[in-house]
């Protein structure tokens, strides 16, 4: 069972340090825990979580080893500072920064080749679900990926991210079944996971953990979700 906290564009180095010091004190044995700070806070998190079982991952990674790609960071650069992995293809990257299935596939491949652990995100928009296109969208997004021991997928129904909406257990179960039928890797749920719904979501047999957004920003709520995973 894996619980990953995606901090998005929150928490600079000082707030990251405070959070990581608090997280170190928590008893979270029995699950894998990953925090995903912004680029400027990665080194602080790596330093303060060294010697624990808590891993640090980035929120994005480029497919080239180096080059004239202003604003990007390579897998090798992340590895050099001790970063364990990266999120790739989050819906906000697709929506605001023009990520496509093709570029997501390239980023995932490069990160895996460099030895990073990857959380690759897939999921449909509300419009796509309303049109009955969920299965087609998921199949298309998964088609650029291949099984790997260092790859997990996160199903994030886009309409549930940051909206307070959550897929019903049946919706999540159906989506996870489809994903697992296409790619034999663990699948996390990632749509407005919070302490109030974590136990129900994580109790489903085909849910292998959670990619947590807003609820990962507060130590109390993040650790509550982690404990729900421990007891699931």
Model-identified regions with their sequence ranges:
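Active-site loop-to-helix "anion-binding N-cap" substructures in soluble metabolic enzymes
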Residues: 1-232
């Amino acid at each position: 069972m894996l619980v990953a906290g995606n901090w998005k564009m929150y928490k600079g180095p000082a707030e990251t340090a405070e959070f990581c010091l608090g997280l170190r004190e928590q008893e979270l044995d029995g699950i894998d825990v990953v925090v995903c700070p912004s680029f400027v806070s990665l080194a602080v998190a790596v330093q303060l979580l060294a010697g624990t079982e808590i891993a640090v991952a980035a929120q994005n990674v480029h497919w080239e080893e180096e080059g004239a790609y202003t604003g990007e960071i390579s897998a090798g650069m992340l590895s050099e500072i001790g970063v364990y992995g990266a999120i790739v293809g989050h819906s906000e990257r697709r929506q605001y920064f023009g990520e496509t299935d093709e570029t997501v596939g390239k980023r995932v491949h490069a990160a895996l080749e460099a030895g990073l652990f990857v959380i690759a995100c897939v999921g449909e928009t509300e419009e796509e679900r309303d049109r009955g296109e969920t299965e087609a969208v998921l199949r298309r997004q998964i088609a650029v990926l291949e099984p790997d021991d260092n790859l997990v997928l996160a199903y994030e129904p886009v309409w549930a991210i940051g909206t307070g909406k959550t897929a019903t257990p049946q919706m999540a179960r159906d989506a996870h079944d489809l994903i697992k039928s296409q790619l034999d890797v663990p699948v996390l749920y990632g749509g407005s996971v919070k302490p109030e719904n974590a136990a129900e979501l994580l109790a489903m047999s085909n849910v292998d953990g959670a990619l947590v957004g807003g609820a990962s920003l507060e130590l109390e709520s993040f650790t509550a979700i982690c404990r729900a995973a421990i007891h699931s």
